[in-house]
């Protein structure tokens, strides 16, 4: 009886070890880029803060509580634009205090259960002289990748926001793989987002040459029609007249669907997930038009299986009023869908 009990015990022990190993293997099953893209879901950009020359100089300082507010509202993710190039020394080392500020912001976003995307944003010199500053972008990413190498897989990297001007499609297709290469040396499996050229315009997806990398997501931005979304914007030259409406007419909706289908067809052909990294209409447009446009863009992105992030949280395009501590409705609902 003792010998039989011992045999049974050993069998149960082996069975338990097999089950434990199986559970561990299940926990470490690699998600596909499409599954990670689904985790982005519905997000919002923390715009006008860390991508300003100095945080706060454009009116927005990221408070820790913002991430709790965003999560409780139902958003899945945040995209954090960052102007690293304003905080580097002559040898391109990132300022320690600025790096720690970014770390703090990322930590707070992740602590609140938000998928977090960090990028390089407003690297103006790169736009004008990509041959000279492309290697600087690589150096910046080497430091970022090292700093965040042990972070969870819900932190994503986005190499650069809206390549354009002298950073032509041809130049971009040569520079971004070099940044990706240094990221992969330190973060071999982390999701990396790559913007399409020409200000991340939907029509430029065809100009992006994809790398042999299964852990990437491709991103485009959507501000069409531009004379509606950017009417009255002070930074646009010449300044666009105010008063342009978007009424949700059949032809207006169809235009958005056609643009998104163009992106979707390319994505299916190349088997890559799509992230609509920015979309929004400036506050100089009337609220009714903004709500209709935002809701239509969001719904169309959902129909095509794109993840998305509204531009932006609490500034000129914002869906949250910092002064009153309330959501701007019905615009926030239009951006999120609930």
Please report, for each region that a protein language model flagged, where it lies by residue.
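N-terminal carbohydrate-binding accessory modules
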Residues: 24-79, 92-93, 266, 334
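An active-site-proximal structural segment forming one wall of the substrate-binding cleft
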Residues: 67-76, 92-122, 127-156, 172-186, ...
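Active-site region of glycoside hydrolase catalytic domains
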Residues: 138-250, 257-281, 303-306
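Acidic/histidine-rich helix-loop elements
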Residues: 46-64, 84-95, 229-255
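C-terminal motif of bacterial Sec signal peptides marking the signal peptidase cleavage site
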Residues: 20-22
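Bacterial N-terminal signal peptides that target proteins for export
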Residues: 1-9
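Aromatic-rich peripheral "rim/lid" segments of glycoside hydrolase catalytic domains that contact
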Residues: 286-338
């Amino acid at each position: 009886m003792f010998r039989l009990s011992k045999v049974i015990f050993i069998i149960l022990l082996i069975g338990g070890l097999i089950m434990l190993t199986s559970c561990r293997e299940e926990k470490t099953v690699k998600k596909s880029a499409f599954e990670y893209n689904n985790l982005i879901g519905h997000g919002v950009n923390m715009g006008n803060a860390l991508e300003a020359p100095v945080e706060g100089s454009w009116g927005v300082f990221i408070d820790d509580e913002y991430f709790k507010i965003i999560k409780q509202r139902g958003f899945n993710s945040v995209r954090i634009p960052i102007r690293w190039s304003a905080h580097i020394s002559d040898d391109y080392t990132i300022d320690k205090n600025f790096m720690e500020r970014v770390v703090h912001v990322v930590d707070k976003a992740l602590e609140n259960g938000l998928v977090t995307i960090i990028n390089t944003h407003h690297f103006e010199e790169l736009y004008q002289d990509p041959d000279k500053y492309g290697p600087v972008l690589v150096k910046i990413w080497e430091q970022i990748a090292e700093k965040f190498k042990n972070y969870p897989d819900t932190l994503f990297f986005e190499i650069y926001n809206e390549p354009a001007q002298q950073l032509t499609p041809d130049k971009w297709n040569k520079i971004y793989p070099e940044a990706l290469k240094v990221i992969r040396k330190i973060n071999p499996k982390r999701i990396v987002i790559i913007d399409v050229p020409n200000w991340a315009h939907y029509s430029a997806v065809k100009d992006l040459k994809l790398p042999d990398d299964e852990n990437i997501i491709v991103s485009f931005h959507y501000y069409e029609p531009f004379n509606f979304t950017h009417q009255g914007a002070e930074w646009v030259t010449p300044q666009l007249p105010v008063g342009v409406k978007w009424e949700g007419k059949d032809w207006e909706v169809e235009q958005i669907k056609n643009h998104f289908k163009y992106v979707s067809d390319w994505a299916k052909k190349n088997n890559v997930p799509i992230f609509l990294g920015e979309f929004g209409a400036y506050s100089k447009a009337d609220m009714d038009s903004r709500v209709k446009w935002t809701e239509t863009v969001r719904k169309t992105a959902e129909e095509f299986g794109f993840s998305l992030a509204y531009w932006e949280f609490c500034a000129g395009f914002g869906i949250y009023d910092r002064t009153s501590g309330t959501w701007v409705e019905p615009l926030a609902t239009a951006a999120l869908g609930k």
